[in-house]
Amino acid sequence: MRLAVVFGRRRYIGRRRTGVSPALTDTTAAPYRLRTDPTVYSVILAVSFCHFINDIMQSLLAAIYPMIKDDYGLDFWQIGLLTFTFQVTASLLQPLIGMYTDKRPLPYSLSFGMGSSLTGLLLLGFASHYWVLLVGAAFIGIGSAIFHPESSRVARLASGGRYGLAQSLFQVGGNTGQAIGPLLAAFIVVPRGQESVSWFAFAALVGMVVLWRVGMWYARNRIAAASRHGAGRELPFARNRIVLALVVLGILTFSKNVYMASLSSYYTFYVIEKFGVSIQDSQVLLFVLLGAAAIGTIIGGPLGDRFGARTVIWFSILGVLPFTLALPHVDLFWTAVLSAVIGLILASAFPAIVVFAQELLPGRVGMVAGIFFGFAFGMGGLGAAVLGIVADIRGIDYVYGICAFLPALGLLTVFLPDMKQARH
């Protein structure tokens, strides 16, 4: 490892004399070393597995909404408030945690974050009042806020320069967990009741052990990584152009996550109300949607490495528009098909968005991950709360009618800079 670091420095010094950008030389030295390290993929898969566990716990909250709505006599706005509590708790803390850990990495905080989510699960399982559900949702949000910035940094460190692939593998664990959550709710929680939610605390314990081991690997490797990337903090564009690009990425994240929040929070109610399916069948349909989103996440990162993040963002945000416009006007079969297509295409955007933002702000991996994961949670939570109020007033059909136009904001991708221009 020391030889690889020294070799990376020599390449950097030599190329600097020929006029090659320090940021580029820094990123070309690191991939060579990482690709020869057999432990890298085990680390990426470990954080992906824990992302899987983390997002199962998150998705259980939304998956039990139909059950607790009946048991507690909740209105749609109260369902939206649960989502809002979870996602806004995560969104407020993630950027702060990311900024702090950019300066002072906390390798073992990953295990602590999983413990917070475990606490939230236990509260959800044994809650007897609505306010306890809110506290449980907040603990799960805190766990996510701690988990995402540091685990995203670990995935990037272990990427070997294939940032899109690493981000996809990391995120697909979460998407798969979100997809399986409704099935677990349908076949375990719904038949056995609310207390069965607490059974999944055992999975959280496994995650804590795995993340402790990941933290040990991270603690050993972060010093060498800091020396490799310390010179690669030069901004690729003028500051005002970077600010504009980040604003555009934020708007695109808003459009994607508000629409996905409308699906994850209210899709089960939509198919129950419009097509008369059972609660269990609605959870299976939600699994189809979220499973397609998991596949989209796998596809998005490698496509970004191959064709560029900007191209993937163009396709994934704007390309989904015809399908969202058609969704409110089709029967049950085509609702299942179109929702799967929508989930697949939209989910392919987020790995590309995160990687693009990290390239705009080199050396700020944790902050960028915290902002965009946190912003995604926050916008999703705010969107769920607002859409819940709209659903109470105008009905679920109306919600999907107005949300269908959100992907049109993908036209703003035209304002994103071409990253190839930053390297010449």
For each predicted feature, which ranges?
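Structural signature of the two symmetry-related core transmembrane helices
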Residues: Y108-L123, T311-L325, A404
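Conserved MFS/SLC helix-loop-helix module at the cytosolic interface between two early adjacent transmembrane helices
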Residues: L92-W131
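Helix-breaking motifs and short loop linkers at transmembrane-helix boundaries and internal kinks
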Residues: G73, P105, F126-W131, G160, ...
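Helix-loop-helix hairpin linking two adjacent transmembrane segments in secondary transporters
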Residues: F170-A219
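Extracytoplasmic gate region of multi-pass secondary transporters
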Residues: L61-A62, L244-A294
